């Protein structure tokens, strides 16, 4: 073996050696045809065609004529390729059935790479042909002349549906080829997209296995290929940044050799996330996921309090206060670099919401309690708060409509979809390994498929879907009233405790006076106004979509992607829109002592837009 990095491009056999442009090689597999040959659409004289050409073009009658005249279907041509190979690579299912009925050997080896027809079909990505050949007993575990089985070829060429089908039919997700390469390693090296790597990871593939010769992990191979998409997936799945190959090189070392700044930064961040580059006492805390989560949730509590507390201090020197604010900023920077991880995008907004409401309630009970009427103000405020806490808790912790399936159900679904010609990534989720119901979507934040997906809300730390959308609407409604009461409390406090001259000196003088009178109260007021704006806008948008359009936020944003929506430049026509009144009754499931009969849908199992579904799997009148 060579000593330098270039050895990875000079190894023989089924070791990564092809350049990216050779992934679809113009080789013996397609016999010079750039794409699988289509059927002839014009009248032609097929009577002079030999059986190989007729097979390539799918001329069934000519092929049958020659076979009936005595041609041996097992006989290879001058290039050692059988008719079954040519039918397989050009996806001629009817001819495959015919040739096998006439005695063709389904696993006969042929061609320069000594491959089976199943290998040829796999390389070209013909899932329907793979299914058909395996129905006739083709063995996907057989290796070709390069030492690869079908799952390795499918992973190399990015045929995700075929990878899924082969695994569902029993192929080992960690199967090694003759050179010790797993499907994950091939996908990491050859396929610069999320799939099939994401699919393999979902099947609990061994992320940190090393290949037979170089001892490179999938992360090593992704770095060698500059596959940034897959690098991110592997790191999220627990890829070991410090794993070393036979030369003692880590993935980070290889990235530095290639001087790829993006890869170097991300691999170093992965090390830091595990606490490897921190002092020992910080490393232990950094490695504690629960502690990191508490820090991310708790930081907003500290920051909101310190901002108001420093402003409220009876200190005339703004220099001192400025230095104190600088200390707050430095503390936040330290915490963020030491303990914040990729989950901060969901943890921080939730922490900000919880912290804001906590300090608002502290302000209400310690500043407003003695100034406001109990019956007319405090009692309604407390009742509203109970409803707010209930709906927030349900929005935060309840199941938003996660589509669940057992391992066996997932594999069964894959096989059923493949064998019916429906294993399309537009209706199949390669992460959750389920058939996606209508109106569902895979949430990239939660990494789950959600029924009737609306959006992922960072303010409640959860997706909003079929299971909690009504609670989310209740949360917005009662939150808006809570904020209005808070603003009312601030204004009342200023009227009772602050000397103001609004009518005499105008608005800006009034702002200065109330900010000086109680900086803490002014800080709470600013928070209230900020939250009022986004809550009011979100509530109005949600109500408009629910009542007038009959669609979710996801559907409104991506309507052009869904065939069942009719989209113009000015409107979206939804098959789920039944008029404002009907939409409201169905969404909130209003019954009013039997006056209304809402239509209840199990969106986790609804795969079509038709409404005449039986109870438990579709629309149901109550």
Curated annotation (Swiss-Prot):
**Where is the DHHC domain positioned along the sequence?**
427-477
Q: What is its EC number?
A: 2.3.1.225, 2.3.1.-
The catalytic residues are 457
A GO cellular component annotation in the UniProt record = Golgi-associated vesicle membrane
State the Pfam families in the record: Ank_2, DHHC
The catalytic activity, as recorded, is: L-cysteinyl-[protein] + hexadecanoyl-CoA = S-hexadecanoyl-L-cysteinyl-[protein] + CoA; L-cysteinyl-[protein] + tetradecanoyl-CoA = S-tetradecanoyl-L-cysteinyl-[protein] + CoA; L-cysteinyl-[protein] + octadecanoyl-CoA = S-octadecanoyl-L-cysteinyl-[protein] + CoA
Which residues, if any, are the signal sequence? none
- Does S-adenosyl-L-methionine count among this protein's keywords? no
Q: Give each disulfide bond as a residue pair.
A: none
Q: Name one GO molecular function term.
A: identical protein binding
Q: How is it modified after translation?
A: Autopalmitoylated. Autopalmitoylation has a regulatory role in ZDHHC17-mediated Mg(2+) transport.
Gene behind this protein: Zdhhc17
Keyword check for Transmembrane, yes or no. Answer: yes
EC main group:
transferase
- Which regions face the Lumenal side of the membrane? 337-347, 393-470, 527-529
Q: Which Gene3D superfamilies match?
A: Ankyrin repeat-containing domain
Per the record, the major location class is Golgi
The protein's UniProt keywords, in alphabetical order, are: Acyltransferase, ANK repeat, Cell membrane, Cell projection, Cytoplasmic vesicle, Golgi apparatus, Lipoprotein, Membrane, Palmitate, Repeat, Synapse, Transferase, Transmembrane, Transmembrane helix
Record's subcellular location = Golgi apparatus membrane; Cytoplasmic vesicle membrane; Presynaptic cell membrane
Spell out the protein name for this chain: Palmitoyltransferase ZDHHC17
Alphabetized PROSITE patterns for the sequence: ANK_REP_REGION, ANK_REPEAT, DHHC
One of the protein's GO biological processes: axonogenesis
Repeat ANK: residue ranges? 41-76, 79-108, 113-142, 146-175, 179-209, 214-243, 247-276
